[in-house]
Amino acid sequence: MQYDVVGFQTDGDVQNFVRYLISECNQTQKIRVFEAADRHVTLEVNGRKTLIGSFPVGIEPRAFARLARRNEGSPLVKNLVASLGGRNLVIGVDRLDYSKGLIQRLDAFDIFLANHNEWLGKLTYLQITPTNRAEIPEYSELQQALESAAGRINGKYGEVSWTPIRYVNRVYSRSVLAGLYRTARVGLVTPLRDGMNLVAKEYVAAQDPDDPGVLILSRFAGAAIDFRRALLVNPYDAESVASALAQALVMPLEERRARHEALYAKVCEYDVNRWQREFLTALRRGREHESFQSDSSNGEPPNLDTIGVRIAPNAEIEN
C-alpha cells in the first residue's frame, strides 16, 4: 500500500476492500486496523498507514439546474419536443458498455409495451448511446445487438406516424443533455452494476421542481444508497422494470414533487464541492496520522466489527 488515501464511492466498497486486504494479505504482511472518522478506515500495512474511505462523487446541482432551464428552449430540444407531438418522453443516456444493462433495458421496454397497450403511440423512448471502443469486437457486437433489438421493437409496435424507440449513437453536449433531461417525463438509469452514476444525479438536478419527472434507478448503482425515493429496480428483472415504467408514467404530481424534493436534497448534500473537500481533508488526516488509535496491535487478525465504517441499510455490496 503506497498511497496516503484510497477512495471509493460507497461504504460497501470500502468494507469489501478492507475485507479483501485482511483476508489476502494478513498472513504475509503485518496489518493493523485503526478506527477513523465516519466512513473512513486507516490500515497500517508493514508500518505504512493508508486511509481508506468512501467519497461519493457529485455534481454541481444548482449550476446544472440553471443549464437545464436555459437549454430547455434550445433549438435541438424544441425540435425534439415538437416532433413528439405531445407524447411523453422517456430518456436513457449511457456509454456503450455491457455494465449499463442496455439489452436488458430494451427487453423491459418491450414487455412494457406488450403489457400496457394503452401507451402505444403515447410515449417515445430516446436512448442516447455514443459509440466507443468500436475497434473491440465485443463492443461492436453489443452495438449491433442493440440496433437489432431497437429495430425489432420498432417493427413490432411502431406505426407510420410513431416510432417507439429513437436510438442514436452520436455525442451530445452537456448543455443539450441538460435540456433533454428536463423535458423527459421518465429517466431510465438501470446499470447492471455501477460505482455511482452521475446521469441519475444530473437527471434529478435538471427537473422542474413544480412538475418533475420520475427517476427509475437500478438498485445496483452506488447512487441508489442515497436515492431511496427513486423507483428502485432490479435491472435483471425485466418485468419489474416494465412495471416501474408504468408506475412512473401515471404517478400523481404530488408524489412526483415529494420524491424529487428528497432526491434533489441528496444531490445537494453530496455535491462535487463536498467530494473535493472531504477528499482533501482525508488526505491531510492521512498524512498527519492524527487521532488514530491502534485497534489490533497484538498481532491477532483484526476484528472487522470494530472498523468505523457505516453501512447504509440494505445497501448493495459489490463483490
Which residues are covered by each model-predicted region?
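Catalytic cores of carbohydrate-active enzymes across secretory and cytosolic contexts
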Residues: 1-319
